[in-house]
Amino acid sequence: MPDELLELREPDGAYARVEEWLRERGFFAPGGEELVAELYLGYGLSRAIRRTRTPSPPEPCAALPLAGCRIGAREWPSSSGGYVIGAWERTWTAAEHELAIEEVRSAIARGDVYQVNLVQHLRAPFAGDAGGLSQRLAALRPLHPAPFVAGDWAVVSASPELFLSRRGDRIWTMPIKGTRPRGAAAELRSSEKDAAEHVMIVDLERNDLSRVCVAGTVRWPELMATRELAGVEHMVSTVEGTLREGVGPAEILAATFPGGSVTGAPKIAAVDLIAALEPVGRGASMGALGVIRGNGDFDLALTIRTFAIAEQEIHLWVGGGIVWDSDPAHEVEESWTKARPLLAAIGSPAPEASLR
């Protein structure tokens, strides 16, 4: 099959358009079981579920579409080229980030939300090869999603978090909430704050899957396990269910995207507050990246720990969940706990002074 690329720049009807485009090319039909497509979904698709009229923040890389889907064989060279990354700049100062966290706490006090995920954005000049960047990240996370490269833009991820997997009528998600530096798993397990934050998201994911699953089949066989992933300690759960007959990819994505661990709870209220507080859009981050097969199965990672490359710049977003008892300074530092291993892995550590 020849290489073909679909790019979408509007959120309305995006999931249905992706499914339709794939069906037109033989997916989800007899004889198409062996077909495979790459799928990228940007966080900006969440605009479709927003309820308030607050304008969405501007996207920092205009060349990046809201969604992309590619079919056809594509091979990476065995030895990808090099790259050069300039000085990193952050969109938020630490003080601005902490002020936004206090705004979330005020919203929680009013009863508007229970938890909100806030992220900050870094950017730097970039020249070179996205494949080389992906190879460097592989040292940090060997099972990271394959990069999505489309001419003038690329998404390269070291995500440790599963957004959604489907095999036949079984579907599952593995949300991550709770982070500590490597070696601090015991501290993470004993944290009441992280446990509360995590259970909120597990409940949200249970609710999302219930919208497309047979009643009574959604369960959580693993709850609050701790694992070392991508250079840090994480708290992870598994939520799974049995899909209703006839449910297709578009309906599944409309019910579940974006992942609850990158929004907060309730999801729609959290998405509205994120749009009001964050100074720039999330671009390639906090979305999904992976593959979808002709038989309807798919594997999609949540695009945390993810770089976007476009217009001779590289972008990274890092953050975490905010609850009532969050300490603003600690939350800002936790975001850098996530960023440091990534920047070190690509050979471009940010100076400590720029992290404050």
Name every feature range the model reports, one short phrase each.
Residues 1-356:
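Extended alpha-helical targeting/anchoring segments
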